[in-house]
A protein has these predicted regions:
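Active-site core of PLP-dependent enzymes with the aminotransferase class I/II
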Residues: 72-78, 94-115
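A short glycine-threonine-serine/GTX helix/turn-capping micro-motif
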Residues: 77, 172-183
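Structural signature of PLP-dependent enzymes
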Residues: 194-218, 246
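PLP-dependent enzyme catalytic core of the Aspartate aminotransferase-like
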Residues: 198-200, 259-283
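PLP-dependent aspartate aminotransferase-fold enzymes
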Residues: 1-86
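Conserved PLP phosphate-binding loop immediately N-terminal to the Schiff-base lysine helix
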Residues: 91-104, 117-139, 145
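Conserved PLP-binding catalytic core of the aspartate aminotransferase-like
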Residues: 210-214, 221-256
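Active-site PLP attachment segment
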Residues: 139-171, 182-189
Length: 283
């Protein structure tokens, strides 16, 4: 996934002849992405993890990556609208802990088009959950490029990039390569998965399982007199136990994972719905 977002950014820079990139979400571990923390170690706090150290990333990349916050209309006006003309691309996840606001995406689409800025949707996590494709189809906002990852092959390593021909053809003008591009297991698994996804209407099944997981969490919290907050699209649900001190959460979730392991269950604060989760297993 990280390699494919890097390819998308490379093509956007080749196409626009600009260098700066706006980001909103988690797009991998590569230098181009982590470079945003050179100027401010807190830049990725709301996108990945707090306090990530960009040690080893060339300082020459300082100020080449501009972050903005998900569904934040103030950032939309003060950052995206003001600086899009400097940027080769806006790359973002159309679903993070929740679906992007459609008006937020529509405005970003307009800004990108107006400023010769490639709009990239990172669908590595969000695709194939609600539907047999990217979640941008559900939202009705089309990017210029979109990236997909191993979900499309049921977990077998694979990544894909789709997009407008005029941008994709920049691959002829730059250098992109991979040792594993001639490997065929991933594509074969992807074809089989997509066919089965369509046949089973798997998106609907995953949504129903996600709702059941949420119902179980809600009831368990009520039974234990706990206040929880549930986020995410249904197939990618997560929870957080709310306390007076927000710094308690890392301790709470560590304890939760520890106690679940004692029950021989590998669990955290999020659950990715899958076809094999029976009602009995979820209960």
């Amino acid at each position: 996934g990280g390699e494919m977002t890097t390819v998308a950014v490379r093509l956007a820079r080749a196409y626009t002849k600009k260098e700066k990139i706006m980001i909103c979400g988690y797009h991998g571990w590569h230098d181009w992405y982590l470079a945003t923390n050179i100027s401010n170690h807190n830049n990725l706090d709301n996108h990945l993890l707090p306090g990530l150290n960009p040690l080893g990333v060339p300082k020459a990349l300082r100020d080449t990556i501009i972050p903005f916050n998900f569904n934040n209309f103030e950032d939309l006006i003060n950052i995206v609208k003001e600086r899009a003309n400097e940027c080769a691309a806006i790359i973002m996840e159309p679903a993070r802990n929740s679906l992007a606001d459609k008006s937020f995406l529509n405005e970003i689409r307009k800004i990108a088009s107006k400023n010769n800025c490639v709009l990239i949707f990172d669908e590595i996590t969000s695709a194939w959950r609600n539907d047999t494709s990217g979640i941008h189809k559900e939202l009705g906002v089309n990017p210029d490029l979109a990236t997909f990852g191993k979900t499309m092959a049921n977990g077998i390593p694979i990544a894909a990039l789709i997009g407008k021909k005029k941008i994709m053809e920049q691959v002829k003008n730059t250098f992109i390569s991979s040792t594993n591009w001639t490997e065929r297991l991933g594509p074969a698994c992807a074809v089989a998965f997509i066919k089965k996804h369509k046949r089973l209407n798997l998106g609907k099944i995953l949504q129903n399982k996600g709702k059941k997981i949420r119902d179980i969490w809600t009831q368990s919290a009520e039974d234990s007199n706990l206040k929880i907050k549930i986020d995410g699209i249904l197939p990618l649900s997560s929870f957080k136990i709310e306390t007076q001190n927000k710094d308690d959460w890392p301790i709470i979730i560590t304890y939760f994972i520890q106690e679940m392991l004692k029950k021989k269950i590998l669990a955290s604060d999020r659950c990715y719905s899958n076809y094999c989760q029976s009602d009995g297993l979820l209960d």
